[in-house]
């Protein structure tokens, strides 16, 4: 991008010999993003090997083909993998992962066997008990309050997601594996959503395009407006 060879040299010193990281983009492993933007075209094949390899090896065929990369924060890793796939398609003018990402996001939002949505406040299927002290308003042990109505709705927060399948997912603030929320979780959600907005705008069905709209202020809760 800069035309300065020093950056390419530095990159090759760090990632030149990098092989398949066999993991999704996350806060402590950015290899997949580095491979995606590599100045060395041969590294593109390593990116594809990792992207496609995880999809092939981690997909749950019995649960709407959800790609469950890890049982702790599965939705976080899934949306991160959506995002890198969408970036690849955008950068290289392909359509290798966009349709897959679209299906995975539908799963995240509730189109799954358990009818569970892993984005708080998104629809009637949304998780109601995220593992988040400030939004819960709980006083005392989270174990005692695990299913107590929370003081605030943490609208738009991505919870951890299923440890096994959508049908066995437990919506409990006590379960930090499945209901924890974090900044890196939402970073991948927003990144994937942005990529899918562009994908649907260009290649989506009429129904999908019609669903893309700016939410009017009248439909936004007063609590959300004050955040």
What are these regions (language model features)?
Residues 1-6, 10-17, 21, 25-60, ...:
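Aromatic (Trp/Tyr) and acidic
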Residues 65-66:
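Short glycine-/Asp-/Thr-/Trp-enriched loop segments that recur within the blades
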Residues 216-224:
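Proline-enriched interdomain boundary motifs that mark the N-terminal boundary
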């Amino acid at each position: 991008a800069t035309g300065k060879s020093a950056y390419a040299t530095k990159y090759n010193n760090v990632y030149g010999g990098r092989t398949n990281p066999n993991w999704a983009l996350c806060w402590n492993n950015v290899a997949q993003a580095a491979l995606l933007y590599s100045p060395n075209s041969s590294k593109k094949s390593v990116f594809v090997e990792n992207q496609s390899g995880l999809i092939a090896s981690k997909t749950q065929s019995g649960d709407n083909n959800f790609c469950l990369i890890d049982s702790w924060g599965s939705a976080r890793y899934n949306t991160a993998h959506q995002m890198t796939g969408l970036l690849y398609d955008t950068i290289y003018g392909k359509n290798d992962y966009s349709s897959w990402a679209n299906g995975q996001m539908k799963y995240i939002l509730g189109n799954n066997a358990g009818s569970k949505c892993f984005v708080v406040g998104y629809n009637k299927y949304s998780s109601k008990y995220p593992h988040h002290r400030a939004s819960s308003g709980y006083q005392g042990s989270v174990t005692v309050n695990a299913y107590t109505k929370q003081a605030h709705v943490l609208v738009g927060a991505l919870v951890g997601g299923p440890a096994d399948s959508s049908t066995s997912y437990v919506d409990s603030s006590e379960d930090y594996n499945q209901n924890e929320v974090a900044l890196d979780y939402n970073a991948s959600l927003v990144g994937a959503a942005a990529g899918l907005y562009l994908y649907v705008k260009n290649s989506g069905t009429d129904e999908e395009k019609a669903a893309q709209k700016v939410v009017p202020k009248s439909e936004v809760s007063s609590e959300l407006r004050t955040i």
